Amino acid sequence: MLYQGETLQLHWLDNGIAELVFNAPGSVNKLDTRTVASLGEALAVLEKQTELKGLLLRSTKAAFIVGADITEFLSLFAAPAEKLQEWLNFANAIFNRLEDLPVPTISAINGYALGGGCECILATDFRVASPDARIGLPETKLGIMPGFGGSVRLPRLLGNDSALEIIAAGKDVSAKDALKVGLVDAVVAPEKLVEAALKMLQQAIEGKLDWRAYRQPKLEPLKLSPIEAAMSFTTAKGMVMQTAGKHYPAPMTAVKTIEAAARLGRDEALKLETASFVPLARSKEARALVGIFLNDQFVKGQAKKLAKGIEAPKQAAVLGAGIMGGGIAYQSALKGVPVVMKDISDKSLTLGMNEAAKLLNKQLERGKLDGMKMAQVLSTIQPTLDYAGIERAQVIVEAVVENPKIKAAVLSEVEGLIGENTVLASNTSTIPINHLAKSLKRPQNFCGMHFFNPVHRMPLVEIIRGEQTSDSTIAAVVAYASRMGKTPIVVNDCPGFFVNRVLFPYFAGFSMLLRDGADFRQIDKVMEKQFGWPMGPAYLLDVVGIDTAHHAQAVMAAGFPERMGKDYRDAIDVMFDNQRFGQKNQLGFYRYSQDNKGKPRKDNDEQTDVLLAEVSQPRQTISDEEIIARMMIPMINEVVRCLEENIIASPAEADMALVYGIGFPPFHGGAFRYLDTLGTANYVELAQRYAHLGALYQVPAGLRAKAEHNESYYPVAAPLSDVSTGQPA
């Protein structure tokens, strides 16, 4: 043994070849600060070995290196700029030493080699991969860019266009595609991976492969003529502007950095990479996107804990077909849980089966599944007009019309036909679970399971715990949602649960702006282009359905009359009374027609202004800043109330529910991350300017208390102090 660290070892093989093995405690290797420092120590030992002829890098885990340890990022990024730069210089010097070893080097890559793992293998001369390998640089998805030489080495290895595509999009590629673009030199069976790597290394040692010729391009400027460079970078910038936009600066920064470094050798190019990385890492976008990654891990971990030891159901049932029921049945069947789909209407069953078939056809067209798999999935959806087969289901999801009497009747009826341990769940969006539970003899077996539309696309499922819901019921439904490929978040019961409870104050802010003379088109534009929502409120209401929103608004007003009740007609009432229900009947705030691909096309409709004049003051000029404040304050206040009332358990779960349920802009990180970025004291000061608008604008007591000391909702990361180890203070 030449070197033994906590996460890697270095020892001799035969014939002067050394092997550096990544073998961290736990299930995966990460290129954390400890491992980077350890790599430097191992190289220091290796550099003294006069008999060294070659070096092999490999992993003992199912993945080579999954990337950096993202749990360290917030501490690293909280460091002063000069400390972070010092740490990057320290790390890059280590990878340069790996690349500059006076012998050939090779990486044997199995599973994932992402982020820092990819940058590590780029520093070796050769790369051999098993067929299951996936290699890439996902940093831009976290609001940063490669920091260990990825933006320098990848373009010089692959050529500019292929490298820009991977880096700007944060992509990873399969072993097969990596071979095509020159990211790996060979793809071999897993059992022959090390053998093949050693064979290639031996060829390099014997001079049959010119390892210096493989290494040299990575040390030199990019081989591009001025015209080629202009074309390549102009195209890349255009694509980034189109896909990432102004709210996600990392992809454009990466492209511009690669462009600026194109005429430089490795060491000077690395200085530019570091100079670009530091401000990105310290940006609010990076904090938000890293926060989302960490919150996603936390939420998935919570789901695993809740469902520990519980098997997902082997058979499920959906009561109520149509678009929603068909979507739930499709998702269940697609993920391997057969489902009975029951409805009282043959027409609805046909609609539900057609919805499932349509979604499967799209998968077929995209090459995600073949005809046999499609037929198999469809065959596991059993449509029925009676309750045939319902007794086999371990979880039954009621998805009938959003009417408490009808839902209660359906739930009561099915309860009499099923076993004592069968779990019942209601896919309701607003009706309190405690209210529906009154119709049941076994309320402990009942909870809410709120899917979002369209079911196949929206990741969130709200699991609603009623007062009498048992832990085993929650565990079973969480296990089912996870099996369906969804992200379940458990909330406590109240009207609207969490997501709709906080969404309707946002719509109320919209209605009040219209009442005060704002233009709904300007509001949509500001909330989409400036704040970053995928849809502005008017457009979102049209997509949700004005009739659906009108009904839900009434439920919310009854549940929270002091804040959500109103004594005036608003824009939603006007649209509803004029049967302008949105996309479903082609008329809402906007007029809709079909484009040449059959998708809804949104156009302005002058009649909307005529109708809204009934409930609006004459048109007023309202600033973008005021629109954002008046739209967001009611939502944020309600989100905070939900945390204070224990409707939602943590800021992390609240923020992920908002991002996954209603598309809260990821670069803000969710409501609590947004609050922390603004500063609680600044937020309270802002909200007080609009306190005269009513109860929705009154800041909750807990938030006021935090604001007195400008406390944050998320823990403040301890900044990095020791650049030789990368450890926090």
From Swiss-Prot:
Known InterPro entries for this protein?
A: 3-OHacyl-CoA_DH_CS, 3-OHacyl-CoA_DH_NAD-bd, 3HC_DH_C, 6-PGluconate_DH-like_C_sf, ClpP/crotonase-like_dom_sf, Enoyl-CoA_hyd/isom_CS, Enoyl-CoA_hydra/iso, FA_oxidation_alpha_subunit
| Residues at the catalytic site | 450
E.C. no: 4.2.1.17, 5.1.2.3, 5.3.3.8, 1.1.1.35
Site residues by UniProt (Important for catalytic activity): 119, 139
A Pfam family that this protein carries is 3HCDH_N
The record's catalysed reaction(s) read: a (3S)-3-hydroxyacyl-CoA + NAD(+) = a 3-oxoacyl-CoA + NADH + H(+); a (3S)-3-hydroxyacyl-CoA = a (2E)-enoyl-CoA + H2O; a 4-saturated-(3S)-3-hydroxyacyl-CoA = a (3E)-enoyl-CoA + H2O; (3S)-3-hydroxybutanoyl-CoA = (3R)-3-hydroxybutanoyl-CoA
The superkingdom of the source organism is Bacteria
Q: Which GO terms describe its cellular component?
A: fatty acid beta-oxidation multienzyme complex
Reported function:
Involved in the aerobic and anaerobic degradation of long-chain fatty acids via beta-oxidation cycle. Catalyzes the formation of 3-oxoacyl-CoA from enoyl-CoA via L-3-hydroxyacyl-CoA. It can also use D-3-hydroxyacyl-CoA and cis-3-enoyl-CoA as substrate.
- Share what the entry says about its subunit structure, partners included: Heterotetramer of two alpha chains (FadB) and two beta chains (FadA).
Name of protein: Fatty acid oxidation complex subunit alpha
State the organism named in the record. Answer: Serratia proteamaculans (strain 568)
